[in-house]
Amino acid sequence: MQIIRHSEQTLKTALISKNPVLVSQYEKLNAGEQRLMNEAFQPASDLFGPITLHSPSDWITSHPEAPQDFEQFFSDPYRKTPSPNKRSIYIQSIGSLGNTRIISEEYIKWLTGYCKAYFYGLRVKLLEPVPVSVTRCSFRVNENTHNLQIHAGDILKFLKKKKPEDAFCVVGITMIDLYPRDSWNFVFGQASLTDGVGIFSFARYGSDFYSMHYKGKVKKLKKTSSSDYSIFDNYYIPEITSVLLLRSCKTLTHEIGHIFGLRHCQWLACLMQGSNHLEEADRRPLNLCPICLHKLQCAVGFSIVERYKALVRWIDDESSDTPGATPEHSHEDNGNLPKPVEAFKEWKEWIIKCLAVLQK
């Protein structure tokens, strides 16, 4: 295992900058927010640790990239920021997300509620679900895993055409595996920062995807018209478990982070680290490191305390899609289907530690 450990000064500069204007901006944050973010360059911090690499196939090793500090993020001329007229994140589901209509509807509510808390202060809206056929995307059977895949680039074009006027971004979610080009095996997600659209698949997050008995395998793609999407009818959908929900929330917020202009994090263990495979994605935490949190706060303008409180409410309210909704209201809405949040409990404990630092 390799540990990527930066000096205190390097992390401090990455977080605050040496630009007097940005230093002054940082000093205007309240004392609690500065105290939490300063944990970035405290060697003994138990809240934020270094990045660990476990194999040569990990993202940083196999995809060398220049790191992005706060000043580079702030100065990026191509970075998009929500405006008063474009403060909505739209979610578009493609194909079924659950084995029943109720499960599918509840799952997307859970994801919507999580996004509302994670990108606190922005509106999160749902577009009407569509079958794969409506997108007119290319598709194939993966030669290695023998499962159906849809072309990510084609989906991005579809989402761009559907983007509402008040949208900051539109994100597509699907339980069907994605591929970005013929030479690639798969991709978890893909986003276009310029167009403000992204597509993310949760197909590989089911517990059985890599097993010999995976039910989504297709023996052979029949030589039919490229416009015949009937192969997707009743296609296999994994069970919505707590681990699958956690993995879905990670991917969704990571990719939306890219649309805000956050590049892959190379400073500390962080949600915005790249991931090349499922084991690495599981290692990646749900939280943003202080440097990436500073970037997102700059873009959205939230109170860090209120954002963390909203995330705790989402975890505590095991049946609601809305942070802070009453149990009675949500109980009525979802037909008693509990939100599987067991996998989030450890993160809740971490957030509570952060709130203690913020509210000293």
Curated annotation (Swiss-Prot):
The identity of this protein, by name, is Archaemetzincin-2
The UniProt record lists the keyword Calcium: no
Q: Which PROSITE patterns does this one have?
A: ZINC_PROTEASE (PS00142)
Q: Which Pfam families match?
A: Peptidase_M54 (PF07998)
Binding-site residues for Zn(2+) 2, renumbered to this chain? C265, C270, C289, C292
List, from the UniProt record, the residues annotated as the active site of this protein: E255 (proton acceptor)
Q: Which GO terms describe its molecular function?
A: metal ion binding; metallopeptidase activity
Q: Does the keyword Protein biosynthesis apply?
A: no
Co-factor binding details = Binds 2 Zn(2+) ions per subunit. One is catalytic, whereas the other seems to have a structural role.
For this protein, the Enzyme Commission number is 3.4.-.-
Q: Which keywords does UniProt give here?
A: Hydrolase, Metal-binding, Metalloprotease, Protease, Zinc
Q: Which gene encodes it?
A: AMZ2
Annotated function: Probable zinc metalloprotease.
Superkingdom of origin organism: Eukaryota
Question: Which family, according to UniProt?
Answer: Belongs to the peptidase M54 family.
Found, by tissue, as follows: Down-regulated in testis from patients with maturation arrest (MA) or Sertoli cell-only syndrome (SCOS).
Ligand binding (Zn(2+) 1): H254, H258, H264
